[in-house]
Amino acid sequence: MISGFSLISIISFILCITLGMTVYLKKVRYIFYNKLSKIFVVLCLTLALFWALIEFGYRSASDFSTAYSWLKLNVAWYFVMSFLLHFLLLYTENHHLLNRKIAYLIIYGPAIIFFLIDISTNLLFTNPVLESWGWTFGIPANPIIHSISTTWAAFTALFCLYVLLDYSEKLYNINKIKQTRIIIFGICIPIIIGLNTEWLFPILNIKFPELIVPSLTFGLIIMWYGIWIYSPLENKNYYEVIKTEVDKTIRNSGY
């Protein structure tokens, strides 16, 4: 059963894959030291393969067993939030935090815990439920762990916004200010939509499909547009960039 919302999920998958591969080919492949681009590529691919594609699978499933099989695969979306935080900490130059091992435990620890709980129990999600837009996940009768996971995801997103706002106040370069404002706009889209469809609507008992995947996809496109359009690197000739890297490699090899 393919609905309009199922199509939104598969379109998000295609856009994320395209965005991730575009960034890889333009940045990571030739600029070996660019950690920001590498994390962004991983973020895009994780969102595409472990969230958008799986969401399309269970939403468009023809029966309960197919939807159940797809939902059992929906256990790694937590890492999207971790990669998003890691990406924005890199962008905002929080190197003093990222140089500490404890920071990675804080960034990725909760995602690992929720991942392990999700693959071994039904404390986070239960059997699929058929709605007018397709199949969706069921909420446990005792939703404590589920509430903790969604609260963590919301807090992580809001913390990302705080990090960007704090960073923007310290900037003096006009292009960097404009770039950061675009990224702030990009992160606000999934925050506003996600807080409504994932948190407020369920509290008000309003049945509405989750839109965090397409909103985050759109947000990532806007974020990378801001980085790309105001990046000094884009004004350089790629030949010169590659030549510099090749020359450096030759010198280091001793030839």
Where are these regions (language model features)?
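Membrane-cytosol interface motif
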Residues: 243-255
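Juxtamembrane membrane-water interface segments that cap and precede transmembrane helices
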Residues: 129-146
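Individual alpha-helical transmembrane segments in multi-pass integral membrane proteins
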Residues: 2-16, 31-122, 143-158, 206-221
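Hydrophobic membrane-targeting alpha-helices
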Residues: 20-23, 52, 56, 87, ...
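Juxtamembrane membrane-water interface segments of multi-pass membrane proteins
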Residues: 22-33, 91-101, 162-180, 230-240
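Membrane-interfacial helix-loop-helix modules of multi-pass inner-membrane proteins that assemble, modify
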Residues: 121-134, 203
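Interfacial "cap-and-anchor" motif at the non-cytosolic start of specific transmembrane alpha-helices
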Residues: 2, 6, 54, 168, ...
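Short, flexible helix-adjacent loops and helix caps
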Residues: 26-29, 57-62, 173, 200-201
